[in-house]
Amino acid sequence: SWEKFIELTGELGKPLVMRMNLNQQSDGAMWTLHRNLMSTLSPIVDCGVHYIDVMCQMTRSKPVQVYAIGARLTEDIPAGNYNYGQLQIRFEDGSVGWYEAGWGPMISETAYFVKDVFGPKGSVSIVAKNAGGAGKSASIESHSKTESILFHHADLDKDEMFAKEDLVINLED
C-alpha cells in the first residue's frame, strides 16, 4: 500500500531523493478525456498536488523551492496549456523531489511508472509487475497500484559488499 511505501521511507535517513511520475500514453476515449481535462488544467496540476503531498508525508518537511517546466506537444489543446510537465522541489530538510506527468498519444510508455525514493541508508521503490505492462500506461488504476515494494539496504560489509539482501514485499490492493 502507499501507506507502507511512505512508512518504509522513514528508514532511509535524510535527506531523501524522491522520483515519481504519471505519464499516460492515451488514445480513443482516454485521449478524449485527457483533451477535455486540458481545456482547463495540465497533467502536472491534475495529479501533481497528490504526489507533492506524498513527498511532504515522506519528508515531514515543507517545500522551500519549486521549479517547473512544461511542453505543448499537440495543437489539440489550448495554446496556453501543455500536455507534458515536470516539477523539481527542494524541502526544508534538504530533501529533493522530482515529478513528471504527460498525457497524449505521443507519450512514451517506456518509463511511465516511477515511484522511487532513496536516502543515505537505501532505497524504497514501488514495483509494477502487471500494472507496468505494455498498453497499460493510460490506466488510472495501474498508476495507483502497489503490487510490490522493493526495499534496498545500503549497508556494506567489511568487503564493501551489500550486507543485506533486498527485501521484496508483495502486496494486494
Enumerate the predicted regions with their spans.
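A short glycine-threonine-serine/GTX helix/turn-capping micro-motif
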Residues: 39-45, 108, 169-172
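Contiguous beta-strand/loop segments that form the cofactor/metal-binding neighborhood of enzyme cores
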Residues: 50-136
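Predominantly a Rossmann-like dinucleotide-binding segment in NAD(P)-dependent oxidoreductases
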Residues: 1-78, 85
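Active-site donor-binding loop signature of nucleotide-sugar glycosyltransferases
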Residues: 20-22, 101, 119, 171
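Residue-level signal for pocket-adjacent positions within structured domains
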Residues: 33, 38-40, 101-102, 162-164
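Homeobox/homeodomain signature
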Residues: 8, 34-37, 53-56, 107, ...
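C-terminal glycine/acidic-rich active-site capping loop/insertion
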Residues: 91, 114-173
